[in-house]
Curated annotation (Swiss-Prot):
Organism: Salmonella paratyphi A (strain AKU_12601)
Disulfide bonds: none
BP GO annotations: carnitine metabolic process
Function noted in UniProt: Required for anaerobic carnitine reduction. May bring reductant to CaiA.
Gene: fixA
Record key words, sorted: Electron transport, Transport
Family per similarity comment: Belongs to the ETF beta-subunit/FixA family.
Name recorded for this polypeptide: Protein FixA
Molecular-function GO term, any one: electron transfer activity
InterPro entries: ET-Flavoprotein_bsu_CS, ETF_a/b_N, ETF_b, ETF_beta_N, FixA, Rossmann-like_a/b/a_fold
Quaternary structure annotation from Swiss-Prot or TrEMBL: Heterodimer of FixA and FixB.
Pathway: Amine and polyamine metabolism; carnitine metabolism
Residues spanning the signal sequence: none
PANTHER family listed in its UniProt record: ELECTRON TRANSFER FLAVOPROTEIN BETA-SUBUNIT (PTHR21294), PROTEIN FIXA (PTHR21294:SF17)
Amino acid sequence: MKIITCYKCVPDEQDIAINNADGTLDFSKADSKISQYDLNAIEAACQLKQQLGDAQVVAMSVGGKALTNAKGRKDVLSRGPDELIVVIDDQFEQALPQHTATALAAAAQKSGFDLLICGDGSSDLYAQQVGLLVGEALNIPAINGVSKILSLTDSTLTVERELEDEVETLSIPLPAVIAVSTDINTPQIPSMKAILGAAKKPVQVWSPADIGLNSVPAYSTQQVAAPKQRERQRVVIEGDGEEQIAAFVENLRKII
């Protein structure tokens, strides 16, 4: 059984600064990290590996220069995957979800797999599209919002997902793609032994040409700005008479 778990490198929000002049966001000093939602996907894949015993877990990502960071690669591999495959090109920095999915699908097809696991979305865009789009690109079953994996055999996957007013139990044939929610598990913190052992695990670096892609269409960011902060008026209305109630209503109208 070969399981691919996909992840995205995103800017660490703690390092993002706001330019006081125009409110735009400054990413220049922001380190990259694994998208928080993808940590659940990695953990889910590694838990399946422990249950099955003979499974192989491959971490996979497409992106720009952030994927060249040795510390970032080590972080991923320390969390349990046996191998890492990255497809690197500057064009992926601003790739739209469908083009990211196309690249992941091509890379997964080249690698070979039985099950592909994604997070429900990414910490930066949270488009919640890539997992299902990968399934569409490969023409295989895909399910999002998976909150529990009930069973996995050589031919069938059974999962559970919580909807607004019901819980669904779904069985699909392999190969398949699932996008897992944060309810599925709590990602573990890697041990020191796992961190040291991560440096010995294999890493494959591919280009778009290696997976049959010539160019990657991208979106153009016009501006990313923080919402303008409004100064609090600090209006205090004392009492509970009709005049105070009328004053309260009038102040509410001003802010609606």
